[in-house]
């Protein structure tokens, strides 16, 4: 699960509209939509707010945030693909 998927799932479970969560975070609902669909990654400072809003341990959001950043590096850089293959081979 990506960070955006987690945010969307939590928001929908609480019956919250995008505009309501965006307002609580201090961002636009268009930006929140892009976060939920994986087009954008929120600044790390928003993770604490999300943790408080959804009463979820901060580490859960931080883990997904870091995983998203690593994934972006790997998929957007040729060297990242080679590094991933190297890691896979060294773990065998």
Give the label of every model feature segment.
Residues 1, 12-13, 41:
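Short amphipathic helical patch at the helix-1/turn junction of helix-turn-helix
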Residues 5-24, 77, 83-86:
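Short basic helix-loop element that most often maps to the first helix and adjoining turn
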Residues 7, 21-22, 32-35, 61:
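Conserved hydrophobic/aromatic packing and binding residues within compact polymer-binding modules
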Residues 26-41:
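Recognition helix of helix-turn-helix/homeodomain-like DNA-binding domains
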Residues 39-52:
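Short, basic-rich loop-to-helix N-cap that marks the start of a DNA-contacting helix
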Residues 52, 60-92:
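Short, charged recognition helix plus adjacent turn
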